[in-house]
């Protein structure tokens, strides 16, 4: 190509690029002008409104090269109207129990970072139900899992996590530090209590709304301890049952009434109950009932009835001849409302629960009389008051070929129903002492709630193969 041809070619290319650039600039200008008028002329349509006023603001920013039009929707949300929970509703009718949640923590922990826990429970608030447990500060596969059969150490803490998940270091929240706990929501915020320290000088720290509010010193110097399941609140008053003293002799039990984490009143245990530990509490019709563990004598469970309005209580024993502690003797021909029914070995007791509602009463217990295996629910009308009361319905929760453990009550007091639907959980213990081929002791959780329908039974056992952990 001669020099003249090169000049002509370069000139033509330059002119072509100039024309293309001009066309792009004109198109850009037209597009911006069109968008501007389209936004300005279009009436408001279908913008979402949530609990407040919805306004549209158009902001036009000019600079030398482009016109930018930004449309911002500003949603003003009213602050939630928070109120203390009121226990005015009755319990719902229950004819059977439907599955609510199962976390499968041990199965998942075979190949994931799952925390070692025990003493689990569930507790609800206005927006969600959460799982709780006392962590051992290590994972199932961690070397520190050796020795987690022990109940009390400096490494335990009350943790909570979203219901249905397995507890891991990545999805749990520490509520407080300690080796015994309870927690409940009063409708405005959550109160959590943890006991920690040496056996002869333990103490409790009461947290409310995420902050420590009250401290309680040991009053008997012998393992200050509490419920290991949720407390219950009525109009801001949250009674909690605490015990300090021997596990196999007379101890000192107190009912402490809290409001926003602060002590309102303290009562010494009154009534015929002789030993109280690990109460499972629920509320209905402005009364709170706690079904507890007599670790000293009774295979029948003590019952504490609390009036949160007057901040008073009474205690007795479950009248039914259906015994629900473990270990226990065979069911006798008659129950006892005022004294413990002795017998059973080798275990002195286990945390349990009941819902006591006249003809709508249900009792939970291990299937085995002697060990923490299996779990069943028995409908026993008038179990609270009739020493001849017997089962009229039965549902297996865990078959007797599988381990169970602690169990307790909880209710979603914020559910949109005309009654409070009873719910319960069962701790599914795995590892030591029964399965000594692993170094740890931990659990998974299964939870069920009441149904008016008559549903079938199924065994909701843990399901982990311990051999996979070797």
Language-model regions, residue ranges each:
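Heptad-repeat coiled-coil amphipathic alpha-helices that mediate oligomerization/assembly
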Residues: 7, 11-14, 21, 28, ...
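N-linked glycosylation sites
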Residues: 51-54, 67-70, 86, 146, ...
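A short beta-strand motif characteristic of beta-propeller blades
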Residues: 104-106, 214-219, 264-269
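Short beta-strand elements that form the blades of beta-propeller/WD-repeat-like
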Residues: 115, 130-135, 189-196, 237-243, ...
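Structural motif
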Residues: 137-144, 156, 200-205, 248-254, ...
């Amino acid at each position: 190509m001669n020099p003249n041809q090169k000049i002509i070619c370069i000139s033509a290319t330059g002119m072509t690029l100039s024309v293309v650039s001009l066309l792009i600039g004109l198109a850009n200008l037209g597009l911006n002008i069109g968008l501007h008028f389209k936004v300005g002329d279009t009436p408001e349509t279908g913008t979402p409104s949530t609990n407040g006023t919805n306004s549209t603001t158009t902001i036009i920013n000019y600079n030398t090269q482009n016109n930018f039009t930004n449309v911002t929707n500003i949603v003003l949300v009213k602050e939630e109207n928070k109120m203390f929970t009121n226990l005015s509703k009755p319990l719902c009718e229950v004819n059977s129990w439907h599955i609510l949640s199962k976390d499968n923590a041990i199965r998942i922990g075979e190949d994931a970072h799952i925390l070692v826990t025990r003493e689990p429970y569930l507790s609800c608030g206005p927006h969600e139900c959460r799982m709780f447990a006392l962590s051992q500060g290590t994972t199932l596969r961690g070397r520190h899992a050796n020795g987690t059969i022990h109940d009390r150490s400096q490494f335990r803490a009350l943790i909570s996590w979203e219901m249905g998940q397995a507890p891991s270091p990545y999805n749990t929240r520490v509520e407080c530090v300690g080796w015994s706990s309870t927690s409940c929501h009063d409708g405005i915020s959550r109160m959590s209590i943890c006991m920690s320290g040496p056996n002869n000088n333990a103490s409790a720290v009461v947290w409310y709304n995420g902050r420590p509010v009250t401290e309680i010193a040991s009053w008997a110097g012998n393992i200050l301890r509490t419920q290991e399941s949720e407390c219950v609140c009525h109009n801001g008053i949250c009674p909690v049952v605490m015990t300090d003293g021997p596990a196999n002799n007379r101890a000192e039990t107190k009912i402490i009434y809290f409001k926003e984490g602060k002590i309102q009143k303290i009562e010494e245990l009154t009534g015929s109950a002789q030993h109280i530990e690990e109460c499972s509490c629920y509320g209905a019709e402005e009364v709170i009932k706690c079904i507890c563990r007599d670790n000293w004598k009774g295979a029948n469970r003590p019952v504490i009835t609390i009036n949160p309005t007057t901040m008073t209580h009474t205690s007795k024993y479950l009248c039914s001849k259906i015994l629900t502690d473990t270990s226990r003797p065979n069911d006798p021909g008659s129950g006892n409302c005022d004294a413990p029914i002795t017998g059973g070995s080798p275990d002195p007791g286990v945390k349990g629960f009941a819902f006591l509602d006249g003809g709508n009463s249900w009792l939970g217990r291990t299937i085995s009389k002697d060990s923490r295996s299996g779990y069943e629910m028995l409908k026993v009308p008038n179990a609270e008051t009739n020493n001849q009361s017997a089962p009229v319905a039965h549902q297996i929760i865990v078959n007797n070929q599988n381990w169970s453990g602690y169990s307790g009550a909880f209710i979603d007091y914020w559910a949109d129903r005309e009654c409070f639907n009873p719910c319960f959980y069962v701790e599914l213990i795995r590892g030591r002492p029964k399965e000594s081929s692993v170094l740890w002791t931990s659990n998974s959780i299964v939870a069920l709630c009441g149904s008016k329908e008559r549903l079938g039974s199924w065994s909701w056992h843990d399901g982990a193969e311990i051999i996979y952990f070797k």
